[in-house]
Every structure is written in C-alpha cells, then in structure tokens.
Amino acid sequence: MEKLTILVLVATVLLAIQVLVQSDGEKPLKRRVKQYAAKRLSALMRGPRQCTPRNQRCEGDAECCPNLVCKCFTRPDCQSGYKCDTS
C-alpha cells in the first residue's frame, strides 16, 4: 500500500509539472497577440501613412510610397540627391 501511495504522489507531481510547463508555453503567444493588437490600434489611430510619390525627393526607402525605392538620380556621385522611383 505504501508503494502505491508513493507512486500516486509521483504521478501527481509529474502531472502538475507538465501542466505548468504547458501553460508557460502559451504566455509568449498571448503576449505577441496583445502586442500586435496594440500596434494595429496605434496605426489606426494615427491614420494613413503619408508617403513620397514617384520622382519626388527622398532620403530613404521607408518614406517612398509602396512599390517605390529611394534611388540616386544623378550618376555617379549622387550629390544632387535621391528620388522615389520604381525598383
């Protein structure tokens, strides 16, 4: 009887450990979902992003409208500047 009691206790402890490990694995996923929701809400509150249209001056790809990149429009030194253009 004593061996059976010890076996039941060990099984209970192992089951409890398994439940704790599985529940910890879900926390990062929940955190990522909340972070995404917060970023999405923030973007919606800011409104549409203003972008630089084609053939307008730019300083980096991030400011150009979708499907455009910031390119040097004078070769070879690029001292005159950059413009948004197709890739």
Curated annotation (Swiss-Prot):
Principal cellular location given in the protein's record:
secreted
Q: Return the Pfam families for the record.
A: Conotoxin
Its localization reads: Secreted
Post-translational modification, briefly? Contains 4 disulfide bonds.
A Gene Ontology molecular function term for this protein is: ion channel inhibitor activity
Signal peptide (from-to): 1-23
In which tissues or organs does this protein occur? Expressed by the venom duct.
Q: Which UniProt keywords apply?
A: Disulfide bond, Pyrrolidone carboxylic acid, Secreted, Signal, Toxin
Q: State the disulfide connectivity.
A: none
**A cellular component term, taken from the record's GO annotations:** extracellular region
Q: Which residues form the propeptide?
A: 24-49
Q: Does the keyword RNA-binding apply?
A: no
Q: Which family does it belong to?
A: Belongs to the conotoxin O2 superfamily.
In Swiss-Prot or TrEMBL terms, this protein is called: Conotoxin Bt15a
Its taxonomic path starts at: Eukaryota, Metazoa, Spiralia, Lophotrochozoa, Mollusca
